[in-house]
Swiss-Prot record:
EC number: 6.1.1.19
Organism: Haloarcula marismortui (strain ATCC 43049 / DSM 3752 / JCM 8966 / VKM B-1809) (Halobacterium marismortui)
GO cellular component entries: cytoplasm
NCBIfam families: argS (TIGR00456)
Family annotation (Pfam families): Arg_tRNA_synt_N, DALR_1, tRNA-synt_1d
Keyword terms of this UniProt record: Aminoacyl-tRNA synthetase, ATP-binding, Cytoplasm, Ligase, Nucleotide-binding, Protein biosynthesis
Name of the protein described by the UniProt record: Arginine--tRNA ligase
SMART domains according to UniProt: Arg_tRNA_synt_N (SM01016), DALR_1 (SM00836)
EC supergroup of this enzyme: ligase
Localization terms from the record: Cytoplasm
Gene Ontology terms for molecular function: arginine-tRNA ligase activity; ATP binding
Amino acid sequence: MFLQLRAEVEDALADALTTLDLPAEDLGIEEPPEDVDAVLASSVAFRLAGEVGTAPPNVASDIADAIAADDLTYVSDVTTQGPYVNFLPSEAYFAETLQSVTESGFGRLPDRDTSVVVEHTSANPTGPVHVGRARNPIIGDAVARVLDYAGYDVDRHYYVNDAGRQIAVFTWAYETFDEDDLPEPERESPEYEMVRYYRKGNTILEDGDPDEVEAAEAEVQSILQGLEDGDEETYERVAEVVDTVLGGMQNTLGRLPAEFDEFVKETKFMRNGDTDDLVDRLKGLDCAVYEEDAWQLDLPDFEKNLVFLRSDGTSLYTTRDLAHHEWKFDTYDRAVTVLGEDHKLQADQLAAALELLDNDTDQLRQVFYSWVNLPEGGMSTREGTGIDLDDLLDEAIDRAREEVESRLDDRTRGDLDEDDIDRIARQVGIGAVRYDIVSKQPTKGITFEWDRALDFEAQSAPYVQYVHARCCGILGDVETDIPDEPDLDPLSEPEERDLLRELARFPAVIEAAADDLTPHTVATYTRDLAETFNAFYRECPVLDADPETRAARLALVDGTRTTIANALDALGVEAPTSM
């Protein structure tokens, strides 16, 4: 109901300003501080005071007097507090909120008939997913989920670098070395088995005999040239390596979970001629220059030129990515790319080049993120191999299992078997990792800390998940169904009304997170909702209340369960039914 109330306030405020012959372009609507009883407030009096020639509180009073609250559905009264115009909620606002929050799809917005492609992760298929890159799939998947909740038609893409030097080295190494000469894989999974070839190949290229290195480099260059020339046999050789490694990486990413609708390969835009066509168009631009044995764009706003073609006629990653983006613009209404902060220059140059090629770059938005660090000694890892995402997730599950088992009382333990405990440990452990990462502003660097991520008493995934499990436990103890139209009248306690207000905000939180591409604000909302529910739970007995109050409070519990489940789902975090 929050969105409906906001729309009603916008219309009423605009009409009042028009009546007073005042401009209504900027209404200054905002959520007031917690100690103000209003749901929404307007600071428009600040803006208009100079034009009217009187103090802001006087302007606010005139505006409030021009609004007939009796004609509104979701607003009961319009008051002022200094320069602010406050809009108080009506009983209809609370009643319709109580009814809507128990619907399973609460928080999902109407279809916008707008297609969006979200490209994220796109790590080179050269081995296991490293923990340092874990923020990309977590943020990217959450952005896609929030957009989906907001009514967009979303596709999730992984852009596969299958045409660069690293892949050519990998292909040469895979075809050259005997598996018997390689160390045992760290895990029985395709990417762990294949990366052994890649590591040995790089060792040879860095430290090998000069003649051996020269022969290897010639083969690597031959593979790159074969891709550029459209040689089908070369494509097949490369695809065998890429697809095998990518299959294993998918399994790891699926644990988060981060799933994809399509894996779009760079070579697609070489094979279909798009890259060659793009190169011809780039050469025709006024800022195109041939310098230092390469074709480049001398972009006026950048100190560094954008190289798009080497002297030997081979294209670069950025060249193929330009063709990739033009394909996205032709296929989708909007395109979102999630990138590490070290790619910002490349992304800005790409956008500038796309604009020079007459593309509408308003279709394109980027989400940049900083890195995830682990505290010294924070992980047990294999010597010399670094920390892979699988390592982090395994340890998260192990630590979560210890925490869950330590919190089980005799009654709960008797209700759960080992499979249940394994399930809860996975939900809590992986949820803790994902939530801890997605809950931070992407541009801020973070250090992942186990104690914080798995703290059941603090602002963490387990804290929010536990509220969902508690709601499920309460509802599991009753045999009657929640009424389709629960009665609001018994809900008069401040904690009950506070909980209704918080629940009502969820659709607006989704809308804002989708507009701004900020899923971390949904995580903030889940913590606020969990805290508000806990205050309600402490002060308002549910099962021991009189029948009418019990039924109404059960509806509140059911609404909280639904809202937390959907909010966590929008973040890609599971909501356990027991913990």
